[in-house]
Amino acid sequence: MNRSRTEIVAMILDAANGGTTKTKIMYNVMLTYNQLKNYLSILIENNSIEYFEGTKTFKTTEKGLNLLKIHNGMAELLHIIAND
């Protein structure tokens, strides 16, 4: 099953909710190191994820949580429409 970039971003934001390491995100979302590195770079640049140098962890920001909430709402709506 191919995932869209939007789905991958949502999975990363969900995995980083509460704070976690790059390795845990990589395994939870099933991405290669280079793929994850590219996504994290974009998400950090857009203030959707923040990186904590001291603990070497990533955490979804308030903006990222809002994006995730919108994504989940749209996915639910599309699922309802598809089942009508």
Give the residues covered by each predicted segment:
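Short amphipathic alpha-helical interaction segments
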Residues: 30-45
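Basic, amphipathic "hinge/linker" alpha-helix immediately C-terminal to the N-terminal HTH DNA-binding motif
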Residues: 56-71
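Short capping segments at the starts of secondary-structure elements
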Residues: 15-21
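A short, conserved structural fragment
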Residues: 44-53
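Amphipathic alpha-helical dimerization/coiled-coil segments
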Residues: 73-84
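Short alpha-helical segments that sit at the start of domains
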Residues: 1-10
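A short acidic, leucine-rich amphipathic alpha-helix
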Residues: 24-28
